[in-house]
Amino acid sequence: MNNRRFDCIGIVGHPRHPAALATHEILYHWLKARGYAVMVEQQIAHDLNLTDAITGSLADIGQKADLAVVVGGDGNMLGAARVLARYDIKVIGVNRGNLGFLTDLDPDNALQQLSDVLEGEYLSEQRFLLETHVRRTNQQSRISTAINEVVLHPGKVAHMIEFEVYIDDRFAFSQRSDGLIIATPTGSTAYSLSAGGPILTPTLDAIVLVPMFPHTLTARPLVISSSSTIRLKFSHITSDLEISCDSQIALPIQEGEEVLIRRSDFHLNLIHPKDYSYFNTLSTKLGWSKKLF
């Protein structure tokens, strides 16, 4: 493989359990011993008391590092990726979470796998993001991005909402439901999958719309081109209606506002070990049957 080598490595990711910080510390000293320039996310350096470390924010790491190693689960990866996607930096994950669809490296074998990656032995792909605008006429939009999905939902559990969906400015359907999931191929194995949506392979230029508990027997997931623009309109809005991006950022929707969702201009430069297989990951994470022969 004739891949780009790395000179400056960023270490990011906030583990749910303090014991997982040991992975960050081992990784830091391992990289330093091999002569790499290392930047550590500020809070991690503080938690580990790495007083001599070069520290920075996610944006600093995105600007100055060649590779970011995200230690944690998919939640950590999503939070970091929304920032790092704005920069020319490659990203790989060490799984210290549960499923780990986006974090490939096994913590017990991460250093060996990472050693190969640092030698240029890796697979590279781009994952697109969704950009969401909550807006009203003649006013500035509130904007956020998502790697996995954008979800329209009420604040109350099991509270039905009514809305219309327009695709490329053409009416597509109206719905009474608990909400709507708009997912990327990356997000098709997350919340969308739990709601009955299809799995989209990461190379597809597609977006899937998945109804949440629709008040009809005929509503089905809809797959559209990633170049399409989705517009959500409301006849009236309850006080707690929200748009959620990756279940981490919430944008309230107020009376007179509409929601616009489209493919972002940014993308995540995700890399994997050289033996990575998307379908093997699906089989392992979802417990699919083994090969018969």
UniProtKB/Swiss-Prot annotation:
The record marks 176 as: Responsible for conferring strict specificity to NAD. The keyword Hydrolase does not apply. It catalyses: NAD(+) + ATP = ADP + NADP(+) + H(+). Signal peptide: none annotated. NAD(+) binds at residues 74-75, 148-149, 159, 176, 178, 186, 189-194, 248. Its main location: cytoplasm. GO terms for molecular function: ATP binding; metal ion binding; NAD binding; NAD+ kinase activity. Its cofactor is a divalent metal cation. Involved in the regulation of the intracellular balance of NAD and NADP, and is a key enzyme in the biosynthesis of NADP. Catalyzes specifically the phosphorylation on 2'-hydroxyl of the adenosine moiety of NAD to yield NADP. Belongs to the NAD kinase family. This is NAD kinase. It comes from Yersinia pestis.
